[in-house]
Amino acid sequence: MIKTYLAIIISCLTGLSLQAQYAYFGNRGTISFDKVTYTKARMRQMSNDMSSKMMDRGMGFMEHLDKMPESHTDRMNLYFDENATVLMPEESTSTEKQNGEGKMRAPNVTANGRGGRNQGGARGGGGGNQRGMLRGGANKNGKVLYQDLKAGTADIQLNIDEKYLLSETLDSITWRFTEEFRNIAGINCRRVNGATKDSLYLIAYYAEEIPVSAGPALSHGLPGMILGLVIPEMHIQYWATNIAYTNNLVPTDWRDKKSKQMKLEEFSALFGRYMPRNRQNESAKKRILEQLVY
């Protein structure tokens, strides 16, 4: 009888140990993100860029700037496992913030890291209807970003005049670690400052509790999942709001077999031809690539 009790106790302790390990170091699951685009600031910058290049359209933007919302928020889901991630929008979940009014779940972070608020959230073992969300609940016309972490490649599926599936190698990002920390979705995250090969400045907050080197908008290269991503130059921010650990692999049924496949660089060159002559340069191509990814 004593041996039986001991066996039960050992079994319970082992189960609790495994459960704790799974809860704190989960490498499969779904992360809900708020993607916040600061519309006015973004349009103001575009107008200034056009004005500096002697383009008449720049002044046209300024006339309508006061009528634009301060920001626009899209809800995104990031599905992840040890080897891959898929980021796609939820259906009908965008919100706008007019003239500084209204609620916004994501904190505001400037390039120097000041301002904003801590992000609360829930963590759990949900996500059992993951594939159903992809087939029925996801925005089928929305952009989908896929990372193959093992192969170091990415696919971007988007719908313009028709559906395209663009392939690209994951570019390295140079990261510089700081001693600043922020709580995002209930997890303590460390801030790092980064730069892409095209010198686009990034601010990221990653969590070692999720040992997957990935994040939203094809971000990667850190010793943990990126739960906060800020692109100051583009006035775009991603903030995790909820994390659900599961046993599911990243789904693959998001791909449309009818999508037109090409390299990302080919796509950039193709659409660059429709831009004004004075914008057919490397800077314009860079802008196109940034718009596709972020």
Name these PLM-found stretches:
Residues 1-26, 294:
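Bacterial Sec-dependent N-terminal signal peptides
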Residues 19-188, 195, 201-202, 231-294:
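Extracellular or lumenal secretory-pathway regions
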Residues 189-191, 226:
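A general structural signal for well-ordered alpha-helical packing
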Residues 195-216:
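Short, surface-exposed, low-complexity cationic segments
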Residues 209-239:
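Surface-exposed, gly/pro-biased binding rims or lids
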